[in-house]
Amino acid sequence: MTSFFDSDSSSNVAEYSVSELSGSIKRTLEQAFEHVRVRGEISGYRGPHSSGHAYFALKDDRARMEAVIWKGTFARLKLRPEEGMEVIATGRVTTFPGSSKYQIVIDSLEPAGAGALMALLEERKRKLAAEGLFDAARKRPLPFMPKVIGVVTSPTGAVIRDILHRIADRFPVHVVVWPVRVQGDGASEEVAAAIRGFNALEEGGPIPRPDVLIVARGGGSLEDLWGFNDEAVVRAVAASGIPLISAVGHETDWTLIDYASDQRAPTPTGAAEMAVPVKADLEAQVANLSARLQAAATRQMDHRRHALRALARALPSLDQLLALPRRRFDEAAAGLGRGLQMNTANKRRSFERIAAHLRPELLTTRIREQRRHLLEAINKAERCVERQIDRRQARVSAADASLRTLPSRLAGQIHRSSDRVSGLGRRADAAMAAEMRRLKGALAAQDRVLQSLSYRNVLQRGFALVRDAAGDPVKQAAAVTAGMALSLEFADGRVSAVAGEEGAPPPAAPKKRASRPVVPTKQGSLF
């Protein structure tokens, strides 16, 4: 009988400690499964830990595997883990010796198939819609005729060629292309950066700021177009201050930026058609509108012309309109001439009456000069009035000719001319009256001078004026001979006398006889 302790100590089976075996298993797993892709459903995910790491499990219908995403890796993930999401995890398998459990350290995550992508897409769509990024009120109309168009797409391929060709065919404008990758790693970041870059351009800068943006890509699978479902791209589209057209994929392909953009085009070519109108159509439309406008203007002019002719027929003739103003003007002109002549004649007669009483030779020359000045003033006034009348008549004749086309203005001008002629007549009368007053004043002054120089004032002081038989004044005693008949003129009358011899006694005084009345002389008062 063999004892339990009688074992063969020389057995070839190696002996390991627990730590040694756990370490050996760890190294074996890490070497054998250094880089693996595992497909499974995320289970037990509660979001990142306070440390920043994420812990959850991957499972299928028969097994379960623990998984971890370190903090640095989690920040770089394009796809965030979500509970129940089916994913393909890429990483390495390792164990934790302290608990003899193996797990996968994930380096990247991607959806497992179209179903998972669609589920993720719907979830993201609901989230962004709840924030109002897809609201119709946020969408802006596209400019009718942009000067600059910005295009965000790949610089190579058929998309950019189709857009440029279509714009050149319809309405050539300035196109600025921002080259980006439209698929693969970094595509979404480049598209979002391009949209923000176009919005950052300043008006009048070296690179013109676009009036409208086109984000375009050709068709492809859901995975190919996934970059345009990225949240950063959608937010950049929603925040764009420039109206944006999304043209990603074909008409049946929808991405999240289609909901956030201002307009969605079924194809890149359709986006170019939305961005610019057809120049030929615009020219035809302008020509049509111009023709319609010209026709409408012609019709309106014809209508106005017929209406004007009808109104003209209803108006009286030009001669009828001008008959009364002409007659009034002729009467005023004739009355003005007659009035001036009568006034001048009256003033002349009055002047002659006054001048007839001015006998002294001292004033004769002055009066004759004043009369000449007066006649010159009268003639000058008459010539001035005649010239005024001639000018007014010439103006009225010119107004008469012009008023054949402008009746209303001619009638007003004739009235104004009549008023002006009447005013000139009044001014002429006033000037004549003022001149006569001035001449009367001058004559009165001359009369006063004449009175002051008259010899009668000397006789009033007791002197006598001796005249010979011929009536001439005797100025010297030597001119008197004895027996000469003399006439002595005193202030109150005349006395006859005979001259005696020098030294003879004076004759006896004659008998007093009744004084005869004083004969008034021809020298009367001036007025």
Swiss-Prot record:
UniProt xrefs under InterPro entries: Exonuc_VII_L, Exonuc_VII_lsu_C, OB-fold_nuc-bd_dom
Domain of life: Bacteria
Protein keywords: Cytoplasm, Exonuclease, Hydrolase, Nuclease
Molecular function terms from GO: exodeoxyribonuclease VII activity; nucleic acid binding
GO terms under cellular component: cytoplasm; exodeoxyribonuclease VII complex
Pfam families: Exonuc_VII_L, tRNA_anti_2
GO biological process, one term: DNA catabolic process
Catalysed conversion reaction: Exonucleolytic cleavage in either 5'- to 3'- or 3'- to 5'-direction to yield nucleoside 5'-phosphates
Compartments in which it is found: Cytoplasm
Region (Disordered), start-end ranges: 499-527
Enzyme Commission no: 3.1.11.6
Assembly and interaction partners: Heterooligomer composed of large and small subunits.
Function summary: Bidirectionally degrades single-stranded DNA into large acid-insoluble oligonucleotides, which are then degraded further into small acid-soluble oligonucleotides.
Protein family: Belongs to the XseA family.
Protein name (Swiss-Prot/TrEMBL): Exodeoxyribonuclease 7 large subunit
Origin organism lineage: Bacteria, Pseudomonadati, Pseudomonadota, Alphaproteobacteria, Hyphomicrobiales
Designated gene of the protein: xseA
